[in-house]
């Protein structure tokens, strides 16, 4: 049997830490935790099952760095010391395997409903906002921005205290950091808006502050969306952003592509994939993770050839928690959805998570 390259160990160059293989469980919303932000045993079991399944890195669901940054019910938080005890239980469980555990830190911004947080949603600018009682978001003041940076920093330090191997800053999918990055959502004319270097200032200041407050060997990475037309994130700006990020002492850039085999929506004459375009734009990049619609071993091998160092997966790991162990077989091509409720229960999804996945067309069937 031929063995896939994805099953081979990988070393983070900056800190000389070795992963067992090149697989990454990407962050996925699962809504399994408690209203006070304490992570539940169900969510721990869900992640632990995938660590037992051989993933090199386990990434938690997005975890809010402040009460006002919460975006959905059942989201666990890291904004208060009361969260640490149960997070230690999570990291201890993951470290009983060979996996690393990374917390994805985020603030929902305009996507944090007032009915959940009790606060008018905060964003880079005053924007139309269905989640606000006023119909508008609040433009972040200098004081707000300072608090945001401190919230991310304090949350990262709590993750260190709780035993995480590192953190991933969620700069993708239209949440707060990407609202600052987007041309259509960042309408500011101060140092936090305008040209890309200003729109990226929040992200860069968060990184700088975190790096000053955690040990040198604590993993710090960033997840970004190469393109989001609705908020004005263009590929040309993402390429420039990657150029800025590669000069920083970070360990990875995670490209959230949704489908790693698709081409750019903006560069219609470009034949290469988003991952190819970005990885071929520079030398000496930090570790590149790419995620989106990888299912089989051949898919994963294809993505490595595109220039990714590590392979992120989401949906396939919901139904196949031991995907990372089986991917070494180059002929591995696991079942696609739909999955039965029984299959998902056996894969350590609780009733709430299964109900949430029923919102995804043709993902869940009763029998």
Write out the residue ranges for each language-model feature:
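Flavin-dependent oxidoreductase catalytic cores
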Residues: 1-367
